[in-house]
Amino acid sequence: MKILIINSGSSSIKYQLMVMPANEVICSGMIDRIGLETSNITFKTVSNSFEEILPVPTHKVGLQKVADMLLDAETGVIKTTSEITAVGHRVVHGGSYFSNTTVITEEVKEKIKELSELAPLHNPAHLVGINVAEEIFASAKQVAVFDTAFHQTIPVEAHKYAIPNFLLTEHKVRVYGFHGTSHKYVSEKAINYLEKGSKIITIHLGNGCSMTAVKDGKSIDTTMGFSPANGLVMGTRAGDIDQSVIFYMVKSLGYTPDEVNSILLKQSGMLGLTGYSDLRDIESKASEGNKDCQLALLMNAYRIRKTIGSYAAALNGLDAIVFTAGIGENSSFMRNLICTDMDYFGIEIDKEKNQIRSKELREINTPNSIVKILVVPTDEEFEIANQVYQLLEN
């Protein structure tokens, strides 16, 4: 069966067409900078690839462009949209409503919309992608795969906040966790590599960042909480912050709640500390002596190291730490900064192995390291396709 995977972000669309269960990628690509005159469009098959700059004003135009590329007489990979059995959509927040992959109905869309308040950078964009895909790929099943689903196994002592019970029971305020599709995929890869039930910390570092403690394949704790704003220092998100700062900004500094929300989600993190949100720029400026960039990198690494310690305690031991996503897979500098002087935990990084670039799972620890240090490229699109296939087959 042919399954189209769509990851619709606030200003981008990632897509991949796969044949399941053969795990064959027919084509993949991305449209980013949607809404600008200089939208970047990529399309790649086994035998062909191209990139072009075109104005893509809306997600609807973008998804129509994806369909046109798939159907193109010369470079396309399908003859009609009816060849696609299902469209799998990544959805960041499923709240307490969705603990499993779900066929999308009008009721499901209403719930995703309702949860947009908790994931304002993500859920609205996912809804746009779903609505447009329903029009363009009308004969296909539309299926949602939720980032929060993997974290439904977190025990109550870890997911419950120390607040009045009515907020949990009536308003479902709790730790939900995010990046679950990625954490699930890379933890399974690591477990297969280690060939045993294991205690693993997965570290997803991209523009958004999160960590998860995984015991025998199940999430038992994670850094993101009620929303994707919590936890580690991120590209534009502050991560952990004393809630009193929010009250201070509103009561004493005169900001509205919406303004505070915008500051903490879109103007904070590495951007707020340095003026840059892209780690490549920050690393470059730090190497040139920029003190703000140097400090921001140290702050980022410190919070990750501190979390490794707390999760090792929660797991009662540690077999491996796993780096993944754009920064985790590609920044040898950050991996080294995080893992240096962690020998107390039995973590010793091999600086030469750490420099090696590869698209395969690789081990970058020294022979003496008690804890394995793995770099595992994530493949959220494959994980989504696999979950969609399993749902429809069963």
Swiss-Prot record:
Functional pathway: Metabolic intermediate biosynthesis; acetyl-CoA biosynthesis; acetyl-CoA from acetate: step 1/2
Binding positions for ATP per the UniProt entry: K14, H204, L205, G206, N207, G208, D278, L279, R280, G326, I327, G328, E329, N330
Binding residues for Mg(2+): N7, E380
Record GO cellular component, one term: cytoplasm
PANTHER family: ACETATE KINASE, ACETATE KINASE-RELATED
Chain positions of site Transition state stabilizer: H179, R237
Listed NCBIfam families: ackA (TIGR00016)
Keyword flag Translocase: no
GO BP terms in the entry: acetate metabolic process; acetyl-CoA biosynthetic process
Positions contributing to substrate binding: R90
Name of this protein: Acetate kinase
Similarity field: Belongs to the acetokinase family.
Organism (species): Flavobacterium johnsoniae (strain ATCC 17061 / DSM 2064 / JCM 8514 / BCRC 14874 / CCUG 350202 / NBRC 14942 / NCIMB 11054 / UW101)
Localisation: Cytoplasm
Gene3D superfamilies (alphabetical): 3.30.420.40
Record function comment: Catalyzes the formation of acetyl phosphate from acetate and ATP. Can also catalyze the reverse reaction.
Gene Ontology MF annotations: acetate kinase activity; ATP binding; magnesium ion binding
Upper lineage: Bacteria, Pseudomonadati, Bacteroidota, Flavobacteriia, Flavobacteriales
HAMAP family reported in the protein's UniProt record: Acetate_kinase (MF_00020)
EC number: 2.7.2.1
Catalytic site positions: D147 (proton donor/acceptor)
Catalyzed reactions: acetate + ATP = acetyl phosphate + ADP
TM helices/strands, residue ranges: none
Cofactor stoichiometry and binding remark: Mg(2+). Can also accept Mn(2+).
SUPFAM superfamilies given in the database record: Actin-like ATPase domain
Pfam families noted in UniProt: Acetate_kinase
Cofactor(s) annotated in UniProt: Mg(2+); Mn(2+)
Oligomer and partners: Homodimer.
